[in-house]
């Protein structure tokens, strides 16, 4: 406990950390209890121990050098035995060099000084000219607004020093600094004490003004942020961190767009050639549509378009003719023309050509990957605002058609109301826990697709939309136009590659792309179900799980392998590349059952074998073979301490209100992510996250580590971690009982109906609690833990009329008194 308290303190220090000392136990013996405990604590606090060589004459590693895991300023680490001591010297260098400031050029427009009324008036006049088609109308709209932007806010290029930004600086501070310098010169020329005191007063005044200005500026930016992405950007600005993703250094800025464009295009072309050359047979025929077809899209009113625009995030893309701020200010005048473009597109079944171009930015997949290897980058598409608006209108009508005809797969949780990664994982974990509780072994298999969105075959997709999902007429023509003649260009540092034609795939940055992918892969559910294997989808993430007695583990592996081979054959036939190398498999059971299994087990496929892993990462949650979730908890704590330290480094510039918003968005959101999976875990596991929450509360309120934590949590009105878990589980129970949760969760909860007259018969919302065998396994399943906690709530609380009313009452009920 003392080491945890020490690390709690040092891990949140905003400065570079070097912690040296003789910890008096052997780091070179990883199986020792002390070593395991301190290594886990270091990992949880986002710290690393750098000394790996022996530091003692007896060959043990006793002396440690601890730094933050994200820091890399220690170089040339060495252990030397030249000193006359039984301990060796730990030698290292510090990289504290500073980079030279460079000059940079930027093209800017003075949007603030644009006369909105004059701009809108000219736009209304020029856009009134009739156009024969949706493409002509969209092109005229785009060129007109771009012309007006050049007229009212011409682009200018400026070169200036690349110095740290100081948006908080204002003329009053500049005037105070001049007075301070004047007072300093006077004091240094006279040497009088009274002049020194005057200078010190001016110095204090300037310091206080700068501090207040920084605090007010940071507070306003943070409180006005509307998304986590905006908060991240604000924090990076305050910390002086670079927002740009690392890029290869082996090419010039002018060469990079063409290099990336060629790489991305060649990669997809090679995948398609490989898939086309691989023989395959359809495993099952697609189901036929029976219902009310969608033959045409319904035109929308200006009010409907305005409502959709206000529900969207208005962000500027380089393909937009005017920036988002000008769009927002001029929207009442532009809305009739925008509505006309959308309705002509819907009625004619055509998508304007100008909407079919995407700008692609290469993004490094993980921060620790080599940026000089192009395989470590993924293409991220950016589309114009109007194209996404048109897709949003179509998606609204498409979703209505799909829900009316009940066409969505019940175990597909992506892009659906009331569904999330947490509900998907809760369903999977419920099945695995119940299987383990019954004494069985489960096999969880996670499938990985290579460039899943980019290899979709357009003809197969259109055929499936028509025959399986009942889309005909001009609606089908619209989707045909949407997929035909699409282009993309790569944009890197204001340099753009030539457009490349896309013969397959759907754009990932689009509104419709992910939904079209789920419809494209919908028949895969029938392939897996044909083998009687449980499954769940989340976009392109597919998981299969089956269970059997430990003695039948080989049969379990064989069944899954047969299913996997059929899935792979179906995917190949549908031009999707299943990646064997990244597919993972894990056996799940009690510690005793897992220990009794042979150590050489693997999933044997046609051409390869997949080794059995001890843990897998599924939708952001690390699952282990005993479902203890210790690695997930440790990873969550590590991420939280990283962000707490970043917030700590700018805490002096933040108000309590702004700090609270940052901590809520960046730290508590991680503690709460999928925390319903942690229900009924031992207190020793939960206390790791509770310690994170305690440190977050102290950081917000600027309290010492010795201050009692309960009053601080009460002051912030925060539920402790255990109660936050109960809050999430009970909220999902309420939604399940009231049909506001996925069917796969509602179906595992059942109203209790006693076989004879009992007092509980008077409770219409009492849930049946299934019986379990193992006290540490079965009660953790949602179908057990949910009813157990639900039945303990007052009936008046369970009968609340809405989720918001229930959650408000639930927080009061769970809050420590």
Language-model-derived ranges and their functions:
Residues 3-69, 119-132, 199, 222, ...:
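Metal-dependent phosphoesterases centered on the DNase I-like endonuclease/exonuclease/phosphatase
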Residues 6-17, 394-412, 435-437, 514-545:
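Active-site palm subdomain of RNA-directed nucleic acid polymerases
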Residues 13, 17, 70-162, 241, ...:
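Surface polyanion/phosphate-binding segment centered on an Asp-His-Pro turn
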Residues 25-36, 451-469, 543-568, 680:
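Catalytic palm subdomain of template-directed nucleic-acid polymerases
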Residues 49, 62, 99, 141-144, ...:
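Basic/polar low-complexity segments
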Residues 54-71, 77, 295, 562, ...:
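Short, conserved micro-motifs composed of acidic
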Residues 114-148, 607-677:
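Basic, alpha-helical interaction scaffolds
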Residues 264, 291, 295-507, 546, ...:
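Conserved pre-catalytic core of RNA-dependent polymerases
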